[in-house]
């Protein structure tokens, strides 16, 4: 075989091999899934228990994880809003009454509000719930002290960040939050370079189950990965250890 031809063939094989080796990570980068957390805030209504049961079925249908938040009082009235969901769904508290915590004037009463809400959730769910979302998103300078003293390690009270307890303090991580009523699939970035922060879609239990079902069907078409709150913070938020 002509030396020049052999050399050209060898060079071509090397180039092809290099392309084969480089393409998988390149394609992986190009098609990075967008992380999406479905966050449901549940208030006490006449049909709340039925709504929760139907929601659990929709989440299972779409193989979707999520985070559910409710007050201790709502949980007592509608325990199905805890027991209906699989272990893949994180359950968090919103105090006991569901009222704005900063409006409680005394610190010890604020602490009792947070602790009692968590206690009810824990007893019904038979787990140690470590996540919290302040009612109405209302917080003040006491929030992290209250959470730490209550054994809560993750906070989803804000629209632009979530906070987790690490090395003796709460640290924040950026998120992008959307109201389910106004959310559009156009809000999901199409480029991997833009898929930097997790997206949280906020639902309340005044949204029809059929609408949630339809929205999840549309979202799944956009190369997303549904994540739980535990996935985001990197540790289990509904632990059964020690119970």
Regions found by a protein language model. Name each.
Residues 37, 62-145, 149, 153, ...:
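Metal-dependent polysaccharide deacetylase catalytic core of the NodB/CE4 family, i.e.
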Residues 1-40, 48-50, 224-243:
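N-terminal pre-catalytic segment of deacetylase/amide-hydrolase enzymes
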Residues 37-46, 51, 173-232:
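Catalytic grooves of carbohydrate-active enzymes
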Residues 58, 120-124, 190-191, 218:
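A generic secondary-structure signal
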Residues 54-62, 78-88, 211-222:
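Catalytic-core regions built around general acid/base machinery
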Residues 53, 57, 112-115, 119, ...:
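Solvent-exposed, polar/charged alpha-helical surfaces in well-ordered, non-transmembrane soluble domains
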């Amino acid at each position: 075989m002509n030396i020049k031809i052999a050399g050209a063939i060898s060079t071509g094989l090397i180039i092809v091999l290099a392309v084969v080796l480089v393409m998988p990570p390149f394609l992986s980068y190009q098609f990075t899934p967008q992380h999406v957390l479905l966050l449901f805030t549940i208030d006490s209504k006449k049909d709340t228990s039925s709504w929760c049961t139907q929601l659990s079925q929709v989440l299972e249908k779409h193989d979707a994880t999520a985070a559910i938040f409710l007050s201790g009082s709502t949980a007592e009235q509608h325990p199905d809003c805890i027991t209906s969901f699989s272990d893949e769904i994180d359950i968090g508290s919103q105090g006991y009454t569901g009222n704005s915590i900063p409006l409680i004037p005394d610190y010890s009463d604020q602490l009792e509000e947070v602790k009692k809400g968590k206690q009810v959730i824990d007893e019904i769910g038979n787990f140690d719930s470590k996540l919290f979302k302040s009612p109405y998103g209302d917080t003040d300078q006491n929030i992290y002290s209250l959470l730490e003293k209550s054994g809560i390690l993750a906070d989803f009270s804000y629209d632009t960040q979530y906070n987790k307890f690490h090395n003796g303090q709460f640290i924040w991580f950026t998120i992008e939050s959307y109201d389910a009523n106004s959310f559009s699939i156009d809000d999901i970035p199409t480029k991997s370079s833009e898929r930097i922060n997790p997206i949280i879609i906020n639902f309340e239990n005044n949204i029809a189950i059929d609408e949630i079902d339809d929205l999840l069907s549309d979202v799944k078409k956009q190369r997303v990965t549904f994540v739980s709150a535990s996935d985001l913070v990197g540790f289990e938020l509904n632990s059964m250890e020690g119970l």
